[in-house]
Amino acid sequence: MEHRGTSPLLLALALLSALCWRARALPPRGAAFPAVPRLGNRLPFDAASESDRAHGSLKSESDILQNTLPENEKFYFDLSRIIDRNDRHADGIFTTVYSHLLAKLAVKRYLHSLIRKRVSSQDSPVKRHSDAVFTDNYSRFRKQMAVKKYLNSVLTGKRSQEELNPAKLADEAEILEPSFSENYDDVSVDELLSHLPLDL
């Protein structure tokens, strides 16, 4: 039952506060508005010369309004001026804080972009290194297969015309010279390969 009683109470309190808020902007109850000049009621004109009117200083609208207000309404005018000043001050604070926040975000984005560029540029040497390692291993494997094929052809006595090329034989001789003896009759291919320094 208490829950049902609090909802109308809260609603009434909200309505009352809204009405009080709106009523604060109204003039006091007994205050009269300044008299509006009508056609029959002319304001006295102090006769200023033509040059005085041309060079006369213009008053701001707020000064004119404040001079025409009765004494009991000047408080509300000053209050509205203070509220406007506070609004401008709050807007200025918000603008300052917001601009600092945007500057920080811009710096953060810039740093992230620099870090991304640095990381992406560091990936390239690693990739190039892994490509070089693969190429090196693959070329060693191809050399081993060429040596194995050559040794098989030498041991079996079958040599193609391509293998009899003197330039190629000189290259292959440089590869085989340091680790093998001159007698190949009783050596198998597997024994020859076991003596080769093959690093994979």
UniProtKB/Swiss-Prot annotation:
Keyword Plastid: no
Gene Ontology MF annotations: neuropeptide hormone activity; peptide hormone receptor binding; type 1 vasoactive intestinal polypeptide receptor binding
Gene3D superfamilies linked: 6.10.250.590
Gene Ontology terms describing biological process: adenylate cyclase-activating G protein-coupled receptor signaling pathway; epinephrine secretion; photoperiodism; regulation of protein localization
Alphabetical keyword list: Amidation, Cleavage on pair of basic residues, Hormone, Secreted, Signal
Highest rank taxon of the organism: Eukaryota
Localization of this protein: Secreted
Threonine amide modified-residue sites: 156
PROSITE patterns: GLUCAGON
Residues spanning the signal sequence: 1-25
Sequence similarity: Belongs to the glucagon family.
Function: PHM-27 is a bioactive form from proteolysis of the same precursor protein, that causes vasodilation.
Protein name, UniProt field: VIP peptides
Organism: Meleagris gallopavo (Wild turkey)
